[in-house]
C-alpha cells in the first residue's frame, strides 16, 4: 500500500509541475516563474521521498520536453537548469561552509552561462549585441541566488504550514 501511495504522490507532483511548465510556455512572461514553481514541487517530492525525487525531475523534464516545446521551449530548458538545484542544495549544505559557498558559486556561474547559451540557441535575436550576454548572465545569477533563498523559506513554510494543511504527513502512514 505504501508503494502505491508513493507512486501516486510522485505522479501528482509530476502533473502539477508539468502544468506549471505548460502555463509558462503559454504565457511567455511567466517562463522563469513557471520553472521555479515546478522546481518547488520537486522540493516537496525530495522532502517526502528523498531519492525518488530524481524520478520526478526526469519524468517532468521528458513530459515538458514533449509538449511544452510546441509552444515555447524556454520553460523546459529553464526547468532543466533550475530543477536540479533543489536536489543538489541538500548535498551542498552538508559540506563545510567555505566549500559550500564555492560549490554554490560554481553552480550559479555554470547555470547562468548555460541559460544564456540556451536562450541564444533558441531565440538568436534576443542576444544581438555582445554585452547582452553579460546582462543575461548577471540576471540569471541573481535569479538563482534569490531561488536559493526561496528554497530555504519555502522549506520552512512547507514544514510548518503547508504539510499539515494538505495533510501530507497522514498520507504516508
Predicted regions and their residues:
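Hydrophobic transmembrane alpha-helices
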Residues: 1-48, 52-53
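Hydrophobic alpha-helical transmembrane segments
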Residues: 7-12, 36, 54-58, 75-76, ...
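Short helix-perturbing small/polar motifs within transmembrane alpha-helices
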Residues: 10, 78-117
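Interfacial aromatic-anchored transmembrane helix boundaries in multi-pass membrane proteins
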Residues: 22-31, 61-91
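Alpha-helical transmembrane segments of integral membrane proteins, especially early/N-terminal helices
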Residues: 31-41, 69-74, 103-113
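Membrane-helix interface "capping/anchor" motifs
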Residues: 45-56, 93-99
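Central hydrophobic cores of alpha-helical transmembrane segments
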Residues: 54-65, 100-110
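Membrane-embedded alpha-helical hairpins and interfacial helices in multi-pass inner-membrane proteins
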Residues: 99-173
Amino acid at each position: 500500500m505504501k508503494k502505491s501511495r508513493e507512486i501516486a504522490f510522485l505522479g501528482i507532483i509530476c502533473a502539477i509541475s508539468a502544468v506549471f511548465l505548460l502555463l509558462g510556455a503559454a504565457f511567455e512572461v511567466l517562463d522563469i516563474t513557471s520553472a521555479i514553481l515546478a522546481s518547488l514541487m520537486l522540493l516537496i517530492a525530495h522532502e517526502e521521498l528523498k531519492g525518488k525525487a530524481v524520478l520526478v525531475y526526469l519524468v517532468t523534464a521528458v513530459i515538458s520536453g514533449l509538449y511544452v516545446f510546441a509552444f515555447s521551449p524556454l520553460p523546459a530548458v529553464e526547468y532543466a537548469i533550475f530543477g536540479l538545484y533543489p536536489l543538489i542544495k541538500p548535498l551542498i549544505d552538508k559540506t563545510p561552509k567555505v566549500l559550500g559557498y564555492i560549490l554554490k558559486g560554481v553552480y550559479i556561474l555554470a547555470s547562468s552561462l548555460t541559460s544564456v547559451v540556451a536562450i541564444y540557441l533558441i531565440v538568436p535575436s534576443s542576444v544581438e549585441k555582445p554585452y547582452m550576454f553579460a546582462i543575461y548572465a548577471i540576471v540569471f545569477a541573481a535569479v538563482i541566488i534569490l531561488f536559493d533563498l526561496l528554497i530555504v523559506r519555502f522549506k520552512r513554510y512547507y514544514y510548518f504550514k503547508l504539510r499539515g494543511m494538505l495533510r501530507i504527513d497522514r498520507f504516508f502512514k
